[in-house]
C-alpha cells in the first residue's frame, strides 16, 4: 500500500462476486419473509 498510483483502482474488488451472490440470495428472502411475518401480526381475523 505504499505506491499511491492506484487510488481509484482498489486491489481486486469487483462488485458482483460470489460473496455478493451468496449474501443477496440469503438477505433478500430474509428481508421479504421478515416483512411478511411482521405484517401478518397486524391482520385481524
UniProtKB/Swiss-Prot annotation:
Transmembrane residues, as ranges?
Answer: 20-36
Membrane topology, from the record: Single-pass membrane protein
UniProtKB keywords:
Electron transport, Heme, Iron, Membrane, Metal-binding, Photosynthesis, Photosystem II, Thylakoid, Transmembrane, Transmembrane helix, Transport
Q: Name one GO molecular function term.
A: heme binding
Q: Which cofactor does it need?
A: heme b
Where in the cell?
A: Cellular thylakoid membrane
The record's remark on the cofactor is: With its partner (PsbE) binds heme. PSII binds additional chlorophylls, carotenoids and specific lipids.
Which HAMAP family does this chain map to?
Answer: PSII_PsbF
| Protein name in UniProt | Cytochrome b559 subunit beta
Q: Which organism is it from?
A: Trichormus variabilis (strain ATCC 29413 / PCC 7937)
Supply the source organism's classification.
Bacteria, Bacillati, Cyanobacteriota, Cyanophyceae, Nostocales
